[in-house]
Design a protein with these regions (language model features):
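N-terminal "domain-start" segment that seeds a small globular fold
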Residues: 1-13
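C-terminal cap of thioredoxin/glutaredoxin-like
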Residues: 2-5, 21-27, 38-46, 118-204
């Protein structure tokens, strides 16, 4: 089935549209490698200006991560179209990842998880680094939004895009449309600089 044409391009975007380098990251919120990669990428984001690098973050769900789909929907419900809210909430939810890993959740239900996600949405606002992350103060309001058709439709787009792009593991990185196979979850700032700096020099 083809991807329905979205109202806006898939993913959360950071940086200027005319930046010479575009980095696209596919990540899974239940994946420990995505968590590690996210933490490293955040240091790379800070090292380059918006004029140098444009970032696109795409949420996807790996088949062996049962809670990832609802975590993805929760992030979309919280962030809306706001990239900074997305970054803040993803950072927060990764800090709580052990609480919804498969092993921790094997005897619990989807409804239980929805209530945990509602707690995340409320408590994220109390974190200093996520002070503006979420507007939700009422858990019932959040759960209604989480289960809405609109959020479901938005979450499907990057998931299908990942399939079309042959992304089967996370994190996966693309630079200017080409898969960056030399970069992984463990890549340091120096590793990223070794890839990005020559590209920036060539673009001048």
């Amino acid at each position: 089935m083809a991807i329905p044409i979205p109202a806006r391009p898939s993913g959360y975007r950071l940086g200027q549209v005319d930046a010479p380098i575009m980095v696209e990251m596919f990540l899974d919120l239940e994946c420990p490698f995505s968590k590690r990669g996210w933490q490293n990428v955040m240091s790379v984001v800070k090292a380059y200006s918006p004029q140098q690098v444009r970032w696109i973050f795409q949420l996807m769900t790996l088949g062996n991560h049962r809670q990832s789909w609802d975590a993805t929907k929760a992030t979309i419900a919280v962030a809306g179209d706001d990239t900074q809210k997305f970054i803040d909430f993803v950072s927060y939810i990764f800090s709580r990842q052990e609480e919804f890993a498969n092993e921790a959740w094997k005897d619990k239900t989807q409804t239980d998880f929805h209530h945990l996600l509602a707690t995340f949405a409320v408590e994220a606002n109390k974190q200093q680094y996520a002070a503006e992350a979420t507007e939700y103060k009422d858990k019932a309001q959040f759960i209604d939004r989480l289960n809405s058709k609109d959020v479901y439709a938005q979450a499907r787009i990057p998931a299908r895009l990942a399939t079309m792009r042959s992304v089967w593991s996370t994190p996966t990185f693309f630079i200017n449309g080409a898969e960056a196979t030399s970069l992984s979850s463990g890549s340091s700032l120096e590793d990223w600089q070794a890839v990005l700096d020559p590209l920036l020099s060539a673009s001048v």
